[in-house]
């Protein structure tokens, strides 16, 4: 059983110290596609966190029964099943956002963060720590996603969660939205700045030269 300090470490380290996007550079593709609005980024964060946490939990529970030769297939089967459940829940209760996310919910199965934590952590750890590790990595992923979405939506649309923050010229205000920030490549630059900021703040995270 994990103690409180270990639980705290499992939850916070992926957010602050070992972020899956900022440090490990995993899960970048979805960060380009779903961060033009806060609503889609928030729902994607919840979806990835749920899949990562519960896939870690279930894989940890059956880890001793999985033959080593088929462990990847077993992990993929668990992850795919959870992705289907999440996709159907979104279609049932958040249909409009589900349409905006399109295929990207289904593509969670290919997200390196989910598969990476299942293989690197859940296959070697007890269920509760594995579940917390999944939540922590989902939150770390979401922290970057929501930061990128905040910048893109405010500067690209003048809104945040659909609420107008900057008065638009179309409505008699002063702000002219920067449409470039609504294009997927803008997320690359913002993520690059986040990575630069994180590694400048903590030089230990800079990759060693060959």
From Swiss-Prot:
GO terms for molecular function: oxidoreductase activity, acting on NAD(P)H, quinone or similar compound as acceptor. InterPro entries: NqrD, NqrDE/RnfAE. It comes from Aeromonas salmonicida (strain A449). Belongs to the NqrDE/RnfAE family. Its main location: membrane. The keyword Signal does not apply. Its EC number is 7.2.1.1. Composed of six subunits; NqrA, NqrB, NqrC, NqrD, NqrE and NqrF. This is Na(+)-translocating NADH-quinone reductase subunit D. The gene is nqrD. GO terms for biological process: sodium ion transport. It is found in: Cell inner membrane. Keywords: Cell inner membrane, Cell membrane, Ion transport, Membrane, NAD, Sodium, Sodium transport, Translocase, Transmembrane, Transmembrane helix, Transport, Ubiquinone. The chain crosses the membrane at residues 42-62, 72-92, 103-123, 131-151, 178-198. GO terms for cellular component: plasma membrane. It is a multi-pass membrane protein. NQR complex catalyzes the reduction of ubiquinone-1 to ubiquinol by two successive reactions, coupled with the transport of Na(+) ions from the cytoplasm to the periplasm. NqrA to NqrE are probably involved in the second step, the conversion of ubisemiquinone to ubiquinol.
